Amino acid sequence: MPYEPPTHTVERSLRATTGARTVAGVDEVGRGAWAGPVTVCAAVTGLRRPPEGLTDSKLLTPRRRAELDPVLRSWVTAYALGDASPQEIDDLGMTAALRLAAVRALEGLPVRPDAVILDGKHDYLGVPWKVRTVIKGDQSCIAVAAASVIAKVHRDRMMAELGAASEDCADFDFGANAGYPSPVHRAALEERGPTAHHRLSWAYLDALPRWQHLKKVRFSAEAAALESGGQLGFEF
């Protein structure tokens, strides 16, 4: 399907209105998954011409994303990735977990950006950065599109490796679904129950009464850890 290639229009506007010299594009992946982290990439591209075929990662085939990923990592001025774990998502909620992952990505950059272009309509990042939210920014903004591809390839590989390396995860087909809803994923949940890599605050668990107790166990353990001054987190 034909698509309009992303441009530097938003970045140029942000530079002109804020005086920013370094602008980072930020995008996330994994928001709607049942398992695995939410991952954020921050990418600084400058105003150079992008590699051919760059667009929102969701519009690209897995093969094309894999081809573009090393090209983009070499082409961008800088990039960094940040993750928030399933436990952090359960503890904090998705909005705060997104901010945590984004801060980790931005603080991982070798240069501090003066401003940020954030994909979507909600500013989950906030101060101290100057933020411009752009709906479908991963399709229209070059830096955000680059971040979307790098984040997607990184997280997909992470989930595939998790599925291959962990016996507990073998039946969930993470290599194919990356932790997102799928018939195979649902069937494995019904049979085996969620793993330590699943988000227990997600609504899917409401349809699995056999495993409801795991939600209570995790959150009871975390509440006890907080009361004792310990660290949040629980492993099954």
Curated annotation (Swiss-Prot):
Binding site for a divalent metal cation: 27-28, 119
Record GO biological process: DNA replication, removal of RNA primer; mismatch repair
UniProt entry tagged with the keyword Cell wall biogenesis/degradation: no
GO MF term (any one): RNA-DNA hybrid ribonuclease activity
Assigned EC number: 3.1.26.4
A cellular component term, taken from the record's GO annotations: ribonuclease H2 complex
Main localization of the protein described in the UniProt heading: cytoplasm
CDD domains listed in its UniProt record: RNase_HII_bacteria_HII_like (cd07182)
Keywords per UniProt: Cytoplasm, Endonuclease, Hydrolase, Manganese, Metal-binding, Nuclease
Tree of life domain: Bacteria
Entry annotated with the keyword Hydrolase: yes
Entries under Gene3D superfamilies matching the protein: Ribonuclease H-like superfamily/Ribonuclease H
Cofactor dependency: Mn(2+); Mg(2+)
Positions of the RNase H type-2 domain: 21-214
Reactions listed under catalytic activity: Endonucleolytic cleavage to 5'-phosphomonoester
Locations listed in the record: Cytoplasm
InterPro entries in the record: RNase_HII, RNase_HII/HIII, RNase_HII/HIII_dom, RNaseH-like_sf, RNaseH_sf
Covalent S-S links between cysteines: none
Cofactor comment text: Manganese or magnesium. Binds 1 divalent metal ion per monomer in the absence of substrate. May bind a second metal ion after substrate binding.
Record family assignment: Belongs to the RNase HII family.
UniProt xrefs under NCBIfam families: PRK00015.1-3
Function of the protein: Endonuclease that specifically degrades the RNA of RNA-DNA hybrids.
Record's protein name: Ribonuclease HII
Record organism: Streptomyces griseus subsp. griseus (strain JCM 4626 / CBS 651.72 / NBRC 13350 / KCC S-0626 / ISP 5235)
Record gene name: rnhB
